[in-house]
């Protein structure tokens, strides 16, 4: 029996993959010459519907919320995290059924780990993604779907696919979860989906679109999906940095920032943000750095660089202002 290179094949058991001579082409599209006496091993192991086994990898804010959403739909969800407390929190809350000790036997592997450097949250670090890919490659079920919800830089998904030796499907569906507005911006909201190949896209749409009932915006390449999240957050970074620059200008020149901002925002196509405590958190600093790394390679100059300098200057500005206000308060109390 012979399957052509461009023909999608069934997702056979691990024992079948072990005995078949094969050479890798595109994900889920490989050529096999199968002797008749081995045909008995062939069967599709993909579970259907609510019987599918899901492993959420990373049980922080995003992974926990994903697992919670999936479990609320009656799906079979296990969890994996290097943090003991994260696993126990999810188990105690009933968000996951079991702690995964290994990655065997799952139909869907949903990666939700942080991609920032733990020593510097403003810098990306994707080593964890590739280490997980190595583990999935060793233990994962051939033909399963690896969904990357974590924010990643351009080219990461194809590298993951290579580590998996093209034996599993890979897609990227960057999360848009916002903890402060879970009702409107939770797990189920319009999400971008990109995939390494057409077979990967079919699996992605089946899982995220049909099983999880998430509205999807399909893009033609996985690189577009990878860029979407980092561009979204870089754009947000620029908006905040502009507000910070304006606030410093107002403070230093005696203009009321709030009044100016309110006046400007009466125009229908302008929305200047508030300037608060500087741009922090897990996402914006790190994601904008991913974008900066990309633009410096392909453009050279980047306004993100200037925005980062503005944010740093603004942090110093508000620190000085707090110190000045505190000093004036102390002097005022001393006079009294």
Question: Whereabouts are the PLM-identified features?
Answer:
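Conserved NAD(P)H cofactor-binding loop of Rossmann-fold oxidoreductase domains
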Residues: 113-114
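Internal alpha-helical scaffold of NAD(P)-dependent oxidoreductase catalytic cores
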Residues: 35, 40-46, 139, 162-173, ...
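N-terminal Rossmann-like NAD(P) cofactor-binding module of classical short-chain dehydrogenase/reductase
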Residues: 110
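NAD(P)-dependent Rossmann-like dehydrogenase/reductase catalytic/cofactor-binding core
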Residues: 2, 12, 23, 32-52, ...
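Rossmann-like NAD(P)(H) cofactor-binding subdomain of soluble oxidoreductases
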Residues: 117-179
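NAD(P)+-binding Rossmann beta1-loop-alpha1 motif at the extreme N-terminus of oxidoreductases
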Residues: 23, 28, 32-99, 104, ...
């Amino acid at each position: 029996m012979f399957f052509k290179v461009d023909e999608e094949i069934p997702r056979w058991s691990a024992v079948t993959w072990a005995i078949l001579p094969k050479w890798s082409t595109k994900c889920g599209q490989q050529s096999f010459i199968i002797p008749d006496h081995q045909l008995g091993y062939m069967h599709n192991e993909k579970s259907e519907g609510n019987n599918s086994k899901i492993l959420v990898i990373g049980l922080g804010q995003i992974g926990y919320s994903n697992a919670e959403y999936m479990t609320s739909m009656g799906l079979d969800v296990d969890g994996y995290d290097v943090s003991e407390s994260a696993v126990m929190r999810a188990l105690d809350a009933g968000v996951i059924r079991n702690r995964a000790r290994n990655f065997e036997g799952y139909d869907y592997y949903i990666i939700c780990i942080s991609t920032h450097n733990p020593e510097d949250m403003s810098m990306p670090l994707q080593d964890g993604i590739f280490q997980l890919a190595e583990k999935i490659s060793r233990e994962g079920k051939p033909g399963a779907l690896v969904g990357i919800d974590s924010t990643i830089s351009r080219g990461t998904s194809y590298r993951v696919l290579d580590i998996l030796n093209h034996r599993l499907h890979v897609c990227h569906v960057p999360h848009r979860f916002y903890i402060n507005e879970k009702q409107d911006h939770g797990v189920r909201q319009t999400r971008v989906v990109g995939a390494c190949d057409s077979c990967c896209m079919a699996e992605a749409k089946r899982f995220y679109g049909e099983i999880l009932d998430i509205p999807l915006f399909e893009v033609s390449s996985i690189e577009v999906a990878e860029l979407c999240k980092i561009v979204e957050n870089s754009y947000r970074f620029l908006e905040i940095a502009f507000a910070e620059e304006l606030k410093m200008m107002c403070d230093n020149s005696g203009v009321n920032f709030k009044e100016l901002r309110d006046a400007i925002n009466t125009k229908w196509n302008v929305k200047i943000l508030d300037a608060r405590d500087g741009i922090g958190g897990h996402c914006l600093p790190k994601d904008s750095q991913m974008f900066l790394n990309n633009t410096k390679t392909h453009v050279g100059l980047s306004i993100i660089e200037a925005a980062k300098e503005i944010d740093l200057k603004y942090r110093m500005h508000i620190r000085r202002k707090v110190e000045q206000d505190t000093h004036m308060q102390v002097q005022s109390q001393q006079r009294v």
